[in-house]
Each structure stands twice: as C-alpha cells, then as structure tokens.
Amino acid sequence: MVDYYEVLGVQRHASPEDIKKAYRKLALKWHPDKNPENKEEAERKFKQVAEAYEVLSDAKKRDIYDKYGKEGLNGGGGGGSHFDSPFEFGFTFRNPDDVFREFFGGRDPFSFEFFEDPFEDFFGNRRGPRGSRSRGTGSFFSAFSGFPSFGSGFSSFDTGFTSFGSLGHGGLTSFSSTSFGGGGMGNFKSISTSTKMVNGRKITTKRIVENGQERVEVEEDGQLKSLTINGKEQLLRLDNK
C-alpha cells in the first residue's frame, strides 16, 4: 500500500507549506516532459505525487486518510458502515496534469524552477527578492506577479531592483527584477528577467506585469520564440528570420 507521506517525503505532522514545497519539488522532478528517457516510471511517479498532494493538501481528505488510509477515501472498509466517510461512493482523483497546471497557475514552471533552492540558500528560508516572505503556493511566481505577496511591501511610492549572477544551479547565468509603482490602486509595474543556457542555447524569459496584465516573452538566442499574455499564448508573426 502506497504511503502518501512517504511519496512526498514528509513527516505525518508536516505543515501545509511543507506539503506544497514537497509537491513542487517532486512534480518538477518527475514531470514526464523532463524524463523522456524514463517516461513510464516518470508518469507513475508523477501520478503518485499528484495523488499524495491532492489528499494531504486538503484538511478533510487528510484527516480521513490519517484515520482510515486510502480505503477511507475509496469508501471501503466494509462499505463504510463502521465510519462516516464523506466519500461514501469513492473519491475520484483528478488528472495529474490538471493538478500540476492548477498548482503553478497555468504558468511555465520550468523556466523558473531554479528559484527553489538558490534563494533558500541565500536567505536561509523562502523569501522574496525584497526580503518579504512569499505567500500562496510558496513558489516565486507570486513575488513577481503583482498580486498579494508584493502588495504589503509598497508604501506611497516604492522602487526595487534585484540582480543575481550565476548561482550554479540548472545552468542559470543571470536573473534580475525591477518593480515600481504608486500606493493603493495606482500604477504598478514589475519586470523580471532570467537568462540560462540550455544545450548551448541562451534562453531568456522576461515577465512584465503592469496594471493587472501579465506578459511573458521567451527568447532563444535573441529570437522571440513565444509570447503569453495573461496565461494565453499568442500567435507570432514570423515575418523575419
């Protein structure tokens, strides 16, 4: 029988943040697209990790799992007659890809996966570039999106710039972030740029958030390869080479 705590590599008393952090790390590690040479095992692991996160990230499901195991979620145990399970007819797990997309908010996590450890090493714990602890999923996306985790850091007028050189992780060569804007509902603009080498090619990802609109540009060796606005990929007109 699979132990969901073992799948995520966390203790039974793990906090919700611990569970989110574990899922993020393992989902990126075992995503089938990142393991083409070992796709069958990756798909199995990816599915297990998604199932474990789905159960342990939900207080009600986690409580039932702690008491009755996976059987409780399936409405088992003699037809559920000896306990009151809200999943009497069985709990249906979602598609692991849907869990993955929802967790990362529809963004491409692979272009930012190097945020996980280097920042933790620099600050001793998970902190945003301005030193304020990121909230939400615990990923760094919230720190650059102009949503709640950044909001509390702004006074009537605030500017910020952060830049890192090579961190020796995942081929990262540089990362920079600038942000400025007025207080309250005034204009806000955040720009973050990351550059890394992948198979000898220079991949630059630029994320611009302004007045609630998010624009993500990905360039390969200086040539624009993809453009996403508010999570929707735009068609590129390749008039030039």
Curated annotation (Swiss-Prot):
SUPFAM superfamilies: Chaperone J-domain. InterPro entries: DnaJ_domain (IPR001623), DnaJ_domain_CS (IPR018253), DNJB2/6-like (IPR043183), J_dom_sf (IPR036869). It is found in: Cytoplasm, Perinuclear region; Nucleus; Cytoplasm, Myofibril, Sarcomere, Z line. Gene3D superfamilies: DnaJ domain. The keyword Ribonucleoprotein does not apply. GO terms for biological process: chaperone-mediated protein folding. Residues 119-241 are annotated as: Interaction with KRT18. Residues 3-69 form the J domain. Pfam families: DnaJ (PF00226). GO terms for cellular component: nucleus; perinuclear region of cytoplasm; Z disc. The keyword Transmembrane helix does not apply. Residues 2-146 are annotated as: Interaction with HSP70. GO terms for molecular function: Hsp70 protein binding; unfolded protein binding. The modification Omega-N-methylarginine is found at R135. Keywords: Chaperone, Cytoplasm, Methylation, Nucleus. It comes from the Eukaryota. Homooligomer. Interacts with BAG3, HSPB8 and STUB1. Interacts with ALKBH1. Interacts with HSP70, KRT18 and PTTG. Has a stimulatory effect on the ATPase activity of HSP70 in a dose-dependent and time-dependent manner and hence acts as a co-chaperone of HSP70. Plays an indispensable role in the organization of KRT8/KRT18 filaments. Acts as an endogenous molecular chaperone for neuronal proteins including huntingtin. Suppresses aggregation and toxicity of polyglutamine-containing, aggregation-prone proteins. Also reduces cellular toxicity and caspase-3 activity. This is DnaJ homolog subfamily B member 6. It comes from Macaca fascicularis.
